Amino acid sequence: TWRAAERGTLVHPEGVHSRTARRLVDSWLDAAGRPAALELAPEQAAELLALAGVEVVPSVPVHDADEAVAAAQRLGWPVALKSTVPALRHRADLGGVRLDVHDAAELRADVAQVLALAAGHAPAPGRAPLEVQAMAPHGVATVVRSSEDPLFGPVLGFGLGGDTTDLLGDFAYAVTPLTDVDVADIVRAPRSAPRLFGYRGMPPLDVAALEDVLARVSVLADDLPEMLALELNPVVVAERGAYVLGCTVRVGAAARADGPRRALPG
C-alpha cells in the first residue's frame, strides 16, 4: 500500500542558497514596481538558477551575422544558433535551431536563413532575434517545469522533449517537498522514460545528473513561493551530465497558503 511503501528521505542538495535567491527576486520585483507577475530576462533566470547550483549553458543574444560570429569566437566552436521568436524557439524541425555550426561561413549562412524564417512571425518582446550558444554533448532532450499552486505549493513536472510529449500528456508530476524516492519515481514515470535507460541499444544516460537538477529545482521552488513558474527546456541528458540549454522563470507576489497538508505525516 501507499503508506507501507518506501518514501525515502527529503532531498537537500548542497549549494542551494534560497535566502540569497529570495533577496534577489525581491530586488527585481521592487525595481519593476511590484507587478503581479514578472518574466525574468534570460540572464536573470540563469543567475537565479545558479543560486540553486543549476548551471545554464552560456549563450549570447545577437542581432546579425557579425555579432553571431563574434559570439561564437568567444564561446568556442562548434556552437548552436537559435531563434528567439516564440513560434520557432526549440523548433529544429522548423529551422529555428541550428546545431553543430563549425565555422564563420556556415554560421553566416545559418543566420541569414533563420532570420528569413523568422520574418513572418511575431518577435519576442524586448529580445534580440537570435542567440548563439555553446554546444552541449548530444543526448536526450527533457523538460523540467515547476508551477506554484496557491494550496499545494510548487508542483514539479517532468517529461521528455518534443511535441509528442505535449500531445499525449506524457508528463509526470509531484508536489514538493520531494524525497529521493520521489525524484527517482518522477524520472521513471513518463511512458517515454525508457529512452533515458538504454532503449533499443542506445547507451544509458546520466540519470543521476538529471535527478540532481530536479532535486535542486524542487528545493528552490519549495523555498521560494515568489517563483510562480519555471521551465527548463531543454535539459539535455547525455552519457555524462545533464545540460540546461534554456530557462524561463516568472516571479511575483507570494500567494501560497502553506500548511501541514503539503507534508503528510508518516
Predicted segments, located by residue:
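ATP-dependent carboxylate/acyl-activation modules
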Residues: 1-266
